């Protein structure tokens, strides 16, 4: 794992698709506050790319943009909250939320953390890097990820899923790297800012791993949770 936690089991992953669209809709609405045109709003453009990769229906995507931009006469009032703490067996976790009711979210997240340990701000984030994470696929067979990373200004790169490459950037450089990668033979599929662990917990037994995964799944299932980052090997 070692970064953003994702549902592993096929049935759970299928059920999670609707939640994924809900999470992306929130991000789109917030980004669209700064303008409904992705060409003029880099933050919105990046979230729209994520939504397209997730196969969000076009109608859902466009409605979220219009709602966030105030074109439907509805107000969007979400607040960002970040929680730090530990899953069972001292596995470090960072949880990002978007909520329209802070008191509700605080109360419910505290309950979910009873099987782990909720920490103070900074209790685990010191052991994570806040980075841009760009998933891109080669547009040509001879595209060189190392050359592309150097020339586009990425910090590093590593193999991604299904033949993609994950380019890692400084948080402030992500948009510039996204724009530069096509010049060096890569098509950007998604890009987001997030946390990557500097070190990970390993050596857990199957039973212990099952406890950690059950904890993470319960957190991720909460409607207000956007992202779960975990320092867990494997």
Swiss-Prot record:
Subcellular location field: Cytoplasm
GO molecular function terms attached to this record: DNA binding
The keyword Transcription belongs to this UniProt entry's keyword annotation: yes
One of the protein's GO biological processes: regulation of DNA-templated transcription
Record's keyword annotation contains DNA-binding: yes
Gene3D superfamilies in the record: 1.10.10.200, 3.30.70.980
UniProt xrefs under InterPro entries: Integrase-like_N, TACO1_YebC-like_2nd/3rd_dom, TACO1_YebC_N, Transcrip_reg_TACO1-like, Transcrip_reg_TACO1-like_dom3, YebC-like
Disulfide bridge map: none
Keywords assigned: Cytoplasm, DNA-binding, Transcription, Transcription regulation
Entry GO CC: cytoplasm
Similarity comment text for this entry: Belongs to the TACO1 family.
NCBIfam families documented for this protein: PRK12378.1 (NF009044)
UniProt-recorded name of the protein: Probable transcriptional regulatory protein Psyr_3028
Upper lineage: Bacteria, Pseudomonadati, Pseudomonadota, Gammaproteobacteria, Pseudomonadales
């Amino acid at each position: 794992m070692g970064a953003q936690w994702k549902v592993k089991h096929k049935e759970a992953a299928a059920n999670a698709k609707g939640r994924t669209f809900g999470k992306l809709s929130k991000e789109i609405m917030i980004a669209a506050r700064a303008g409904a045109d992705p060409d003029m709003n880099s933050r919105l453009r990046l979230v729209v790319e994520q939504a397209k990769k997730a196969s969000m229906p076009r109608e859902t995507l466009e409605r979220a943009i219009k709602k966030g931009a105030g074109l439907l006469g509805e107000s969007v009032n979400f607040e960002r909250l970040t929680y730090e703490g530990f899953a069972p067996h001292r596995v470090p976790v960072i949880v990002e939320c978007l909520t329209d009711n802070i008191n509700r979210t605080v109360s419910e997240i505290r309950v979910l953390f009873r099987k782990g340990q909720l920490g103070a701000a900074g209790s685990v984030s010191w052991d994570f890097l806040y980075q841009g994470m760009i998933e891109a696929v080669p547009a040509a067979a001879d595209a060189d990820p190392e050359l592309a990373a150097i020339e586009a200004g990425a910090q590093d790169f590593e193999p991604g899923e299904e033949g993609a490459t994950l380019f890692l950037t400084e948080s402030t450089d992500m948009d510039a790297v996204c724009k530069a990668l096509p010049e060096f033979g890569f098509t950007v599929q998604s890009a987001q800012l997030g946390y990557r662990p500097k070190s990970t917990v390993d050596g857990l037994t199957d039973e212990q791993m099952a406890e950690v995964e059950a904890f993470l799944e319960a957190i991720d299932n909460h409607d207000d949770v956007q992202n779960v980052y975990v320092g867990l090997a494997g």
